[in-house]
Amino acid sequence: MKKQEFLDALGAGLSGSSDAEEVLDFYREMIEDRMEDGMEEGAAVEQLGAVEEILARCVQGLTVPKAVCETTAGSGISRVEIREKEFDVTVCEGTEDTYRLEESSEGYHDVTLENGVLRIVRNKRQPERRLFFSASGELTLYLPKGQIQALDVTTCSGDMEVRKDFETVHVTGASSDVTLSGSYSGKVAIQTASGDVTLEGVFAGPLELQTSSGSQELKGRFHSGKLRAASGDIEVAQASVTEDLAVETASGDVELTNVKAQELRLRSASGDIQLERICAELLAIESRSGDMELQQVLAKEEFLCRSTSGDISLTGCDAPKMGFATVSGDITGSLLHGKRFSSRTVSGDIHLPGGTPEGECAISTVSGDANLRVEE
């Protein structure tokens, strides 16, 4: 979808609202900022999400109040909505039963608390622009203690840091870095273009992350996750995943260290994949030209790797059922225990240890070589 098509559809959904033009201006600027960062027009629009989802999130907050509230009783807050452009935003826990908003520059935000929804909206006031001066600022929101039901943030270039417990979190940004540290019992969804995403804490609901050139770093306890990046790297360390973790990149590298998961699925086009000290019920890895370096990777059921031209290197890996397939990539390294080995190749050299009655390991190449040994 093109920019104008997106804006026309959004405008139709906002028909009759006195603040529709302000909302359209906001999303128009988001698309243009992403295109300035090098994204194609269609990709910049797609990053914002479906028009229906945007309308569902913002239609209740279209009437923008004009009175700024700095310190107000915070009881009854169930949802926080922030619509920002260039200010860095920090959301954290206060010490009283109030919410407090601190701005580095006053007068740039309209605030209201109505029917349990706290809304902070960047107004049309423009910062003074000078040569070599970046029009930005800081916005800090202090919230009452306890978990709040939902946080919904849309921003352009300002960074976003959340040090507060919520049930659900939805963040959409362009060049914004996003950092979450806390406990989140529901779904967490974050989309950025060039911004980095850093997560640490307890994420008890489904997690969805999508970046273009931005990197992703995760640490903590997770229910399940879907991580996608184009050229950005993805790193997961010191993490436990109750159910499934799916990771997909184009040219970005993937690095997992000390991770336990029910099911682990990794896919990369040209990015390298590096795993160390991994345990999963099922492990499936796929790459075209990226190399795989796997150390102390264990699967309780199946361990499957497929590559086109990338090499597969194994050190102390094992599973009851293993399979490795390449076209021109080589397969080398060691397994912890012997297997019933089977192999096939067109022109590659295959060197495998003697077979044992326990476990299976299938090797397949076209021109790639295979050389495996057993450590026991």
Regions found by a protein language model. Name each.
Residues 1-376:
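Intrinsically disordered, low-complexity terminal regions
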